[in-house]
Structures are given as structure tokens and as C-alpha cells.
């Protein structure tokens, strides 16, 4: 017991030299279900979707999820790990029982062998979430009751590093079962099939000026803050995104979760301005909550989520960092 206490009190130590020992120990453990990819032999990496050769499935978004109440779609979300989904905090409606549907691009996946519906076991709202008027810190983590097995149709998207270089004019993609108008006088209708739209990153200051014109807030009060992203598109029906749905940006062949759809100016005409929670401002909080969930036993997590962080720890003599033991058990 004394040894355990001493190790827990140790600071960042020689983690890198302990990693081979940890993985050697992992090889001696019996296999655990629902870990890694299945017989499709896809590599267990984030943000690397399988692209079909068929035109109909050219753009495939395997991290897209549907957050549902009583089997009715209410919001989108993004899978970041075998047990965790990121969505918008304003999607959470009190003590409801939520399901997450994965592995399907349609809201009616009858007969699909890949579609899964998994109950949400725990929900973590960001402590600074503000849902009045212009929403702030609009992010929530959903822990699945059962970890998923990754395959061609269910894969995680990568979390961005802190201060992710998101440039104005950069092209990204928003996906969801959003609403659209077939003509100006028509009612908004939800699509049963997953839609996608390419959007451009807009300068936050310019976006802020546009939103201020529609409100009585003085200019000195920023509506679009540093922890938000603003985008625009030029499609006829701009409302492709779902609240909580992902804004995905491709960087060097890897798809990054840049944002989570939060709110927009209007859903009537293009070009349309949409506002997202900027994920790189919350990456540290996400990893902290995932780590706590793993330690408490509520949610298992994948070691891959923490691997970039582990490799950045300094090398120094002494006992290993206690997080290494969490890595060995995850």
C-alpha cells in the first residue's frame, strides 16, 4: 500500500521509458470485448474514415451520431472515443432518457446490420454553460452505457490540439439531419438522410458585427467570442447542421472536430452565418472528464485519446506518472 501511495504522489516522471513495459503487460492480459476495430481490419485511428468507391457513399462520416429521446432525433453529436460523444449542452432537456444512434446515415435504419442504438449512461455539462440569449460554453459530454466496437461505419473523429490553427477562409464540412425549405413559403422539414455542406470559416469580428445588427446589445459586448467559430455557406438551403452536430475540418488527411453546432442567424436564406462551440478551447476539459470517467469506472476509454498527450510528457528519472497505470488499464 505504501508503494501505491508513493507512486500516486509522484509528479511527471520517466513515462516514455515505462511505455514499453506497460504495453508488454497489456500483451499478457486476456482480450477485452469492444476494443479496437473489428474484422474489417481498419486501423484504430481517429479522423480517418473509410471512403466508398460508389458515388452515393463518397462522403461518409462515421463519427456522426443522432441523439434521440424515445427514438426521436433531437440533436447531433460526434463520437470521439469508444465510450464518449460530444454534443451541445443546450440539447440536454432535463432528466430525459437519451439514446445515441451510430453507424447509420439515415434516421430510419431498418435492417441495417451496422446501426446501433446505445443508451446514454452519464451526461457532463460544461460548468460555464450559459443558455440564455446568446449561448456560451455550449458543450456536453455523453458517456455511453456500452462501449462501441469500431468498424467502417463507426469511427471516432480526432480532437484538435490546443490553439488549433483554424484560418479564416478555411473550408470545412458540416453534417446533420438538419432542416430545409423547398421554397420560401414552405415549412421547415427534417431530412431522414444525413446531409453535408461545405462551409467557410468567417472572421469572428466580422461575424460579431452582423449579429449585433440584429440585437440591442452594445458593440462593446462581444457576441462571438474566442471560444466560438463562425461559418458561412452559399447554398440555397443552408440549414444542414443539427444542434450538437460536428464541424469537421480535414488537415493533412486527418479529420479534426473543429466545432459543435450551437446556433445561427436564420434558417431562411443563403448565405447563412452559423456559430459553433470551438472545441480546441475545451480539449483539456474533455480529456480531464474522460480521464475521471475511466478512473471512476463509469466509462471505459480508449488509450488512443491520450496518446498525443503522453508523448509530450518530459523524460526524467523517478517513478512513472500515475496516469501510466490508467493507460495500462484502459
Swiss-Prot record:
GO cellular component term of the entry, any: extracellular space
Keyword Secreted in annotation: yes
Entry similarity comment: Belongs to the peptidase S1 family.
Listed GO MF terms: serine-type endopeptidase activity
Name of the featured protein: Inactive serine protease 45
Cytoplasm keyword on record: no
Domain Peptidase S1: 45-291
UniProt source species: Rattus norvegicus (Rat)
Pfam families: Trypsin
Keywords annotated in UniProt: Disulfide bond, Glycoprotein, Secreted, Signal
Amino acid at each position: 500500500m505504501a508503494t501505491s501511495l508513493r507512486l500516486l504522489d509522484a509528479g511527471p516522471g520517466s513515462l516514455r521509458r515505462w511505455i514499453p513495459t506497460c504495453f508488454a503487460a497489456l500483451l499478457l492480459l486476456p482480450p477485452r470485448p469492444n476494443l479496437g476495430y473489428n474484422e474489417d481490419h481498419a486501423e484504430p485511428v481517429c479522423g480517418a474514415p473509410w471512403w466508398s468507391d460508389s458515388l452515393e457513399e463518397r462522403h461518409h462520416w462515421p463519427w456522426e451520431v443522432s441523439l434521440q429521446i424515445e427514438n426521436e432525433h433531437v440533436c447531433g453529436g460526434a463520437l470521439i472515443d469508444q465510450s464518449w460523444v460530444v454534443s451541445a449542452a443546450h440539447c440536454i432537456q432535463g432528466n430525459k432518457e437519451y439514446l445515441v444512434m451510430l453507424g447509420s446515415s439515415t434516421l430510419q435504419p431498418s435492417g441495417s446490420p451496422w446501426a446501433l442504438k446505445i443508451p446514454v449512461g452519464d451526461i457532463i455539462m460544461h460548468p460555464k454553460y450559459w443558455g440564455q440569449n446568446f449561448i456560451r460554453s455550449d458543450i456536453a459530454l455523453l458517456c455511453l452505457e456500452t462501449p462501441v466496437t469500431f468498424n467502417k461505419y463507426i469511427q471516432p473523429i480526432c480532437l484538435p490540439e490546443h490553439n488549433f490553427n483554424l484560418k479564416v477562409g478555411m473550408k470545412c464540412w458540416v453534417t446533420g439531419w438538419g432542416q430545409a425549405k423547398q421554397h420560401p413559403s414552405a415549412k421547415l422539414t427534417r431530412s431522414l438522410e444525413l446531409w453535408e455542406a461545405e462551409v467557410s470559416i468567417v472572421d469572428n469580428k466580422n461575424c460579431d458585427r452582423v449579429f449585433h445588427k440584429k440585437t440591442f446589445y452594445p458593440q462593446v459586448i462581444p457576441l462571438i467570442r474566442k471560444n466560438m467559430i463562425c461559418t458561412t455557406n452559399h447554398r440555397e438551403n443552408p440549414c444542414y447542421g443539427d444542434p450538437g452536430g460536428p464541424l469537421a475540418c480535414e488537415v493533412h488527411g486527418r479529420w479534426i472536430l473543429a466545432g459543435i453546432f450551437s446556433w445561427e442567424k436564420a434558417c431562411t436564406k443563403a448565405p447563412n452565418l452559423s456559430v459553433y462551440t470551438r472545441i480546441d478551447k475545451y480539449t483539456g476539459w474533455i480529456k480531464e472528464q474522460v480521464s475521471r470517467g475511466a478512473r471512476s469506472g463509469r466509462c471505459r476509454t480508449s488509450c488512443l485519446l491520450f496518446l498525443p498527450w503522453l508523448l509530450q510528457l518530459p523524460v526524467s528519472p523517478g517513478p512513472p506518472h500515475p496516469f501510466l497505470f490508467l493507460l495500462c488499464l484502459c
